[in-house]
């Protein structure tokens, strides 16, 4: 069922790195009542993420990097273990993820498989993330990875079982990473 939405005002509060909007809108409820809402919405663009896995070695490739938002929210070191990811900018999701994989992990991926698209924080963030997986092998390692000039990324090749355990221990706390690791487990690609 489609609800009627009328935009009243869209005020840009910040357009520094991403865009923060203050949006006022009227929402017509199912019973016909019109309710006025005022919300802040953070537009950071859409993104893509990929989990690299090796079924023969039973390993996955993840990265560790500083994430300021986690630091602000109590992660003492600010370090987060996660899947390779990036913003689309003007690229198609598959093009983006191939670029990010080589930059961040050093692996030049072959065939990729798109799984799904998800909003990760739809209450206030516009970002839609495209989720991919790809099998990798040692001979696909083109460089050391580590990201571009302003990034400081550590590449982690981990046993799949250890990565799953790291979810339980709280060492992996990134939503997209947990989703992809759980997908890999339930799909039985590592059996």
Swiss-Prot record:
Binding site for Mg(2+) 2: 100, 104, 151
A GO term for molecular function: metal ion binding
Superkingdom classification of source: Bacteria
Positions contributing to GDP-alpha-D-mannose binding: 17, 38-40, 67, 85-87, 104, 127, 150-151, 176
GO cellular component, one term: cytosol
Reactions mediated catalytically: GDP-alpha-D-mannose + H2O = alpha-D-mannose 1-phosphate + GMP + 2 H(+)
GO biological process terms on file: nucleoside phosphate metabolic process; ribose phosphate metabolic process
Cofactor field: Mg(2+)
EC nos: 3.6.1.-
InterPro entries: NDP_pyrophosphatase, NUDIX_hydrolase-like_dom_sf, NUDIX_hydrolase_dom
Residues that coordinate or bind Mg(2+) 1: 85, 104
Motif placement: Nudix box: 86-106
Residue span(s) of domain Nudix hydrolase: 43-180
Any coiled-coil regions, as ranges: none
Gene3D superfamilies membership: Nucleoside Triphosphate Pyrophosphohydrolase
SUPFAM superfamilies linked: Nudix (SSF55811)
One Pfam family of this chain: NUDIX
Keywords, sorted A to Z: Hydrolase, Magnesium, Metal-binding
CDD domains (UniProt xref): NUDIX_GDPMK
Family: Belongs to the Nudix hydrolase family. NudK subfamily.
Functional note: Nucleoside diphosphate sugar hydrolase that hydrolyzes GDP-mannose as its preferred substrate, yielding GMP and mannose-1-phosphate.
Domain comment quoted from the record: In the dimer, the N-terminal domains are swapped between the two monomers, such that residues of both chains contribute to the active site.
Assembly information from the UniProt record: Homodimer.
The protein, known as: GDP-mannose pyrophosphatase
């Amino acid at each position: 069922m489609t609800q009627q939405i009328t935009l009243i005002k869209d005020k840009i509060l910040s357009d520094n790195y991403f865009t923060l909007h203050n949006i006022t809108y009227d929402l017509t409820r199912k019973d016909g009542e019109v309710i006025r809402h005022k919300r802040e919405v953070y537009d950071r663009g859409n993104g893509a993420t990929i989990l690299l896995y090796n079924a023969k070695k039973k390993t996955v490739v993840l990265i560790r990097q500083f994430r300021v938002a986690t630091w602000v929210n109590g992660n003492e070191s600010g370090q987060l273990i996660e899947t390779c990811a990036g913003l689309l900018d003007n690229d198609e999701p598959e093009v983006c993820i191939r670029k990010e994989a080589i930059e961040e992990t050093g692996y030049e991926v072959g065939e990729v498989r798109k799984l799904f698209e998800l909003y990760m924080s739809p209450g206030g963030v516009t970002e839609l993330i495209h989720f991919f997986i790809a099998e990798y092998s040692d001979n696909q390692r083109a460089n050391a990875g580590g990201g571009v000039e302003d990034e400081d990324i550590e590449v982690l090749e981990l046993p799949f079982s250890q990565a799953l355990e790291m979810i339980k221990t709280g060492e992996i706390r990134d939503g997209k990473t947990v989703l992809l690791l759980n997908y890999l487990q339930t799909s039985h690609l590592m059996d």
